[in-house]
Structure formats: structure tokens, C-alpha cells
């Protein structure tokens, strides 16, 4: 059952000791995705969560992490504008994998925001950035605070976009550690994992959607388009969640 984030017990200690980041990166660069997950869980017991948009290939990270810790909080940011297929996909995977789903939502509903600000996603780059800040960045920040998370897993991959090619397996942002267990996986690696474990792609994947976010800012991949152009009218690739949180 989906819940609002519930507070966890916090065990204060340094996120990473001085000079530890470089050695951890070297250690995990040669490790498997499963070993990277185990490192994160061991290094931050009770203080690490998994973020998921329940996008095209989300089942990989959800399965990979929860097979090691079934009750890890899984944070979904619900903007109120997800595809109907996404909500059903959330329900399907939550039931199948027994997820400890924690749903983070904006301070104001979609209808309230439209009444107050209009359709921000139609107001150019500035409007899109404001929309993403209110509906994605701020809810995620609040969820991490509420859950007492010093670290979080994310399913980013370098192959997904030019903006992700310099991402590291472990990063520090805003005094929190981000762990990317499948950062160096290819599309073929993802497909093999899904096939091996009989896991589904997002339903819209089979209709030509390769990157799936909100209804109003997601398009099918067409001939001549890059994956980046399927989001936010090609004005930007990232929603800001992985840059600002």
C-alpha cells in the first residue's frame, strides 16, 4: 500500500569520512551492481532509500535493491500528472515485489497549481524549471528529510543521456550520498536483466516511449529524435531532481 513517507530512526555519523569518496569510487568502479547495492546498505544501515520514477526500465533497480533489502523505503514523487499506465505500473510492481512504497507529493495539488500559475510547462524554460522545482525537487527533498536518509539509490545510467555521461557510481550532493548501482549498464544489460528475472518494461515502452515522465512533457521517440528530445519539448533533459537534490 502506498504511504506518505514515514520517519525512520536516525543514527548520526559522517556521511563519508574526509578522503573516503575517491577510494570508494575506485572500489565500486570494478564492482558488480549487486556489490554496489550491498555496499550502500552496509554503509548506511537504516539511512538509505531507493528513489524510483517507475519509468521505462524501473523494474531493474527495484528488483536489484529489494532482493537485498525487501523493506527499503521506495520513494516515488507523484506530480499528479503521471500517465495512467504509470500508476497501474506502480501498483503492479508494488504488489509483485512487495515494495515499501513511500509516495511524496507537492505541497499543492495539480488543480490548485494550475489555478494559481497556469500551465507552467507551457511557459518556456523558466516555467518548466519552476514546475519541476515545485513538483519534483521539493517533494523529494522533503521525503529524504522525513525518512532520515543520509543516502539514496538511483537508477541513472550514463547511456541514457549526454547529461549523465560524467556521473559517478557514488556522488555527494547536498550532504547526502547518491549511489548509482547500474550507472555503467547498457541497454543490452538492462534487457538481459529484465529477461532473466521475468520483469516487465513500463507498458508505454512498447508504444515507443523510451523516457517516461509526466503526460504533458513526454513524447514518443520518433525517427531522427534523440532520447533527450522526448522530454520537456527538447528544451532540457533533466527535471532537476538528480542535479539539485
Swiss-Prot record:
Its EC number is 1.8.4.8. It comes from the Bacteria. It comes from Alkalilimnicola ehrlichii (strain ATCC BAA-1101 / DSM 17681 / MLHE-1). Catalyzes the formation of sulfite from phosphoadenosine 5'-phosphosulfate (PAPS) using thioredoxin as an electron donor. PANTHER family: PHOSPHOADENOSINE PHOSPHOSULFATE REDUCTASE. Keywords: Cytoplasm, Oxidoreductase. GO terms for cellular component: cytoplasm. Pfam families: PAPS_reduct. It catalyses: [thioredoxin]-disulfide + sulfite + adenosine 3',5'-bisphosphate + 2 H(+) = [thioredoxin]-dithiol + 3'-phosphoadenylyl sulfate. The active site is at 239 (nucleophile). Signal peptide: none annotated. It is found in: Cytoplasm. One of its GO terms (biological process) is hydrogen sulfide biosynthetic process. SUPFAM superfamilies: Adenine nucleotide alpha hydrolases-like (SSF52402). Belongs to the PAPS reductase family. CysH subfamily. This is Phosphoadenosine 5'-phosphosulfate reductase. GO terms for molecular function: phosphoadenylyl-sulfate reductase (thioredoxin) activity. Pathway: Sulfur metabolism; hydrogen sulfide biosynthesis; sulfite from sulfate: step 3/3. NCBIfam families: cysH, PAPS_reductase, PRK02090.1.
Amino acid at each position: 500500500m502506498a504511504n506518505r513517507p514515514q520517519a525512520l530512526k536516525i543514527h548520526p555519523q559522517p556521511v563519508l569520512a574526509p578522503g573516503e569518496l575517491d577510494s570508494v569510487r575506485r572500489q565500486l568502479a570494478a564492482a558488480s551492481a549487486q556489490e554496489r547495492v550491498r555496499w550502500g546498505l552496509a554503509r548506511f544501515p537504516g539511512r538509505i532509500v531507493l528513489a524510483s520514477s517507475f519509468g521505462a526500465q524501473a523494474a531493474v533497480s527495484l528488483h536489484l535493491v529489494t532482493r537485498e533489502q525487501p523493506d527499503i523505503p521506495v520513494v516515488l514523487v507523484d506530480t499528479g500528472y503521471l500517465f495512467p499506465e504509470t500508476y497501474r505500473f506502480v501498483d503492479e510492481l508494488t504488489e509483485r515485489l512487495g515494495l515499501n512504497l513511500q509516495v511524496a507529493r507537492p505541497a499543492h495539488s495539480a488543480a490548485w497549481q494550475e489555478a494559481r500559475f497556469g500551465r507552467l510547462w507551457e511557459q518556456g524554460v523558466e516555467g518548466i524549471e519552476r514546475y519541476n522545482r515545485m513538483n519534483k525537487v521539493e517533494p523529494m527533498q522533503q521525503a529524504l528529510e522525513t525518512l532520515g536518509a543520509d543516502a539514496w539509490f538511483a537508477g541513472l545510467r550514463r547511456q541514457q543521456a549526454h547529461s549523465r555521461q560524467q556521473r559517478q557510481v557514488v556522488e555527494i550532493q547536498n550532504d547526502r550520498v547518491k549511489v548509482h548501482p547500474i550507472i555503467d549498464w547498457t541497454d543490452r544489460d538492462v534487457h538481459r536483466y529484465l529477461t532473466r528475472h521475468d520483469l516487465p518494461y513500463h507498458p508505454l515502452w512498447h508504444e515507443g516511449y523510451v523516457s517516461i515522465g509526466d503526460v504533458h512533457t513526454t513524447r514518443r521517440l520518433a525517427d531522427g529524435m534523440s532520447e533527450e528530445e522526448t522530454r520537456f519539448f527538447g528544451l532540457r533533459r533533466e527535471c532537476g531532481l538528480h542535479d539539485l537534490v
